Amino acid sequence: MYGLRTLFSLGLLVGGARLGARVAQVGALGGTCPLGQGLVADGNSQCKQFRTGAAMERGLRYLSQEEAQAVDEELFNEYRFSVDQLMELAGLSCAVAITKAYPVSSFTSNLPTVLVVCGPGNNGGDGLVCARHLKLFKGYEPAIHYPKRPNKTLFENLTTQCQKMDIPFVSEFPSEPEVIDGAYNLVVDAVFGFSFKGAVREPFGNILSTLKRVTVPIASVDIPSGWDVEKGNPEGIQPDMLISLTAPKQSAVHFTGRYHFLGGRFVPKALEKKYSLNLPPYPGTECVQKLP
């Protein structure tokens, strides 16, 4: 995704012999890697080095599912962020990142259309916010497919906001990838986030199957839908762009697309320090940062 690669352990260089000892130790402990080590447990219960170039040289932390949930819980409970507040910041970050990777001038068709596919949870809410901001940005024409709408005020409000801004909702998802390729310049995958577990149920199974076969680029919000949060999914969709929110998740090491952005400039410094997130500095007033 993203020479010699440098491995840091809490900011200290780990030599080859010490690394070998650590790998053996972690394997004996069942494959969970120490926090802040720049390591991730693979399917063989061993740790492997993150291969993310300069990002990991700065010690950027990649989170497991449990760690990502813990960070979110602290944002909600300790720092008193609301769900809709974080959703707004996340969705805005996604829209801004898309404009940087896919400016309207790069679209091949005359109509700069973007299909935003939203799931039933918070990731889908991020997608609704993203679509609304894309509509406000000059030139983008988003459309939304939202097959499973939660019966909750937050999501009803987000849906109404998009409708009031004349963003069309696509009732039927095209089963043929050629239809999507011909109608849209970009697909935003906002189906499942890092909290998703278990088998993919319909209609999302067919949706992801179709997205695996499209040729237009896909931008995934936080996690490529259908991926294991920590192990990825080589048989799943392979997005051209990944927008990691708060901090990258461990599955991001398997991302091979062209654009990896970090979004959501809302993490308090004390929380960043507690979890050794080592987030890269955001330039100026930007809410996104491109990762190597």
UniProtKB/Swiss-Prot annotation:
One of its GO terms (molecular function) is NAD(P)HX epimerase activity. Pfam families: YjeF_N. Keywords: Isomerase, Metal-binding, Mitochondrion, NAD, NADP, Nucleotide-binding, Potassium, Secreted, Transit peptide. Its cofactor is K(+). K(+) binds at N123, D189, S225. (6S)-NADPHX binds at N122, N123, G124, G125, D126, G193, F194, S195, F196, K197, G198, A199, D222. GO terms for cellular component: extracellular region; mitochondrion. Its EC number is 5.1.99.6. Residues 68-279 form the YjeF N-terminal domain. This is NAD(P)H-hydrate epimerase. The gene is naxe.
